[in-house]
């Protein structure tokens, strides 16, 4: 079984867990190919929109990271990604046994690296899977990654069971014809209807992982979890879609 999540745009370079080289990376050649393409694309008028760069500081930092990619430091992924989802995994509070289980079970889907493990060492990047960047011989980044990503995921996951916590953007990369995918979602009951709110969803995805580790990744106990007040909703859930809800 593997747990799949999206990466975070927010990244933290001010951490102690870094290396001079990438580690535990599966698709080095494809990542280098993408960075070479980004270098060639810097002067393209669409470059900023491709990478969702909205201020001069971020533009300058991103271009610097791209140009100096080969010499940049690499950071431990589980600490480097710094968004709400990752904060709510509460990694520093996990036992060593739980950290080992996390490394064995969690996969972070990346538009730049393809597959990232919690203990992978990765370099700063900005390329998201939904980017519209032009890639020679491919329709888009989904097309660029789809075959190799799913082949490797199948190798890593022989029982083909996936707990999917990834966003819609990243879930598109998973070949549902190969895997038995359980999608987990969180909805608030607000104004007489159930809605998904990004902030709550990100927090809950991270905390779900924390709590899943607390029950030793027992798939049969998922429905009993309390995720920041969100509880399994039997009426809204269907087939392999597990919906957790709470009142706003």
Curated annotation (Swiss-Prot):
Coiled-coil parts of chain: none
InterPro entries: YaaA
Name under which the protein is recorded: UPF0246 protein MYPE6270
Cellular component, GO annotation: cytosol
Pfam families: H2O2_YaaD
HAMAP family per UniProt: UPF0246
Assigned protein family: Belongs to the UPF0246 family.
């Amino acid at each position: 079984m593997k747990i799949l999540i999206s990466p975070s745009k927010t990244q933290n370079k001010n951490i102690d867990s870094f290396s001079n080289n990438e580690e535990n990376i599966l698709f080095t050649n494809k990542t280098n190919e993408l960075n070479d393409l980004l270098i060639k694309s810097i002067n393209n008028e669409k470059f900023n929109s491709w990478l969702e760069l909205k201020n001069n500081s971020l533009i300058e930092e991103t271009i610097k990271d791209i140009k100096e990619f080969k010499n940049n430091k690499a950071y431990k992924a589980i600490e480097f990604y710094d968004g709400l989802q990752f904060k709510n995994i509460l990694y520093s509070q996990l036992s060593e046994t739980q950290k080992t289980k996390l490394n064995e079970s969690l996969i972070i889907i990346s538009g730049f690296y393809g597959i990232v493990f919690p203990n992978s060492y990765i370099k700063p990047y900005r390329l998201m899977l939904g980017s519209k960047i032009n890639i020679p011989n491919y329709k888009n980044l989904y097309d660029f990654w789809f075959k190799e990503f799913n082949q490797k995921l199948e190798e890593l996951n022989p029982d083909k069971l996936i707990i999917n916590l990834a966003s819609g953007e990243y879930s598109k990369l998973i070949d549902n014809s190969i895997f038995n995918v359980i999608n987990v979602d969180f909805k608030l009951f607000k104004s007489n209807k159930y809605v998904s709110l990004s902030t709550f969803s990100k927090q809950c995805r991270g905390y779900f992982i924390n709590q899943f580790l607390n029950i030793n990744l027992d798939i049969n106990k998922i429905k009993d979890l309390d995720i920041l007040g969100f509880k399994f909703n039997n009426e809204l859930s269907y087939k392999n879609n597990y919906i957790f809800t709470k009142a706003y």
